[in-house]
């Protein structure tokens, strides 16, 4: 079943940049490209311009998501993922990237695909303060409370625990990076 696509107004800030496009039928995200050449050293972050700005219809927002290939092959992540583009924003879309590879620099060329733009309908809600929230099966469980990862397995004795101090300063992610560097 095919639906008519939502029309989103777009302006090229850089007259030569290709417009965001879906790589395959059925893709949720349209590829965004950078308009600059930039090299990122290990651990370095940068704000990359995309050369486009959009006018989204009221009731919609766009979300800037990472591209899995950049993460898997180069260690590039988005610092603010997903980045939110509100319907009223008219400035150039920019993407904050970071090179998480501990050893290799990453080079971006002009018009490299750097992120995906996903447009979604959003609801505005009314918040109503209450003294107590209704119960649920999950209750206050968070941060891995549902399991699904060996490091969160109750049998290992680490379920629900947050890393404490040590050489990574209490940052469990940093300890994973340190372990990877040692391989």
From Swiss-Prot:
Gene Ontology annotations of biological process type: dUMP biosynthetic process; dUTP catabolic process
Residue stretches of biased makeup (Gly residues): 141-150
SUPFAM superfamilies, sorted: dUTPase-like
UniProt-listed Enzyme Commission number(s): 3.6.1.23
Superkingdom of the organism of origin: Bacteria
Record has Metal-binding as a keyword: yes
Catalytic activity field: dUTP + H2O = dUMP + diphosphate + H(+)
Pfam family, one: dUTPase
Matches recorded under InterPro entries: dUTPase, dUTPase-like, dUTPase-like_sf, dUTPase_trimeric
One Gene Ontology molecular-function label: dUTP diphosphatase activity
Binding site for substrate: 67-69, 80, 84-86, 94
Cofactor(s) needed by this chain: Mg(2+)
Pathway: Pyrimidine metabolism; dUMP biosynthesis; dUMP from dCTP (dUTP route): step 2/2
Alphabetic keyword roster: Hydrolase, Magnesium, Metal-binding, Nucleotide metabolism
Residue span of region Disordered: 138-183
Function: This enzyme is involved in nucleotide metabolism: it produces dUMP, the immediate precursor of thymidine nucleotides and it decreases the intracellular concentration of dUTP so that uracil cannot be incorporated into DNA.
Similarity-based family: Belongs to the dUTPase family.
Entries under PANTHER family matching the protein: DEOXYURIDINE 5'-TRIPHOSPHATE NUCLEOTIDOHYDROLASE (PTHR11241:SF0)
Protein name, as recorded: Deoxyuridine 5'-triphosphate nucleotidohydrolase
Record lineage: Bacteria, Bacillati, Actinomycetota, Actinomycetes, Kitasatosporales
Gene responsible for this protein: dut
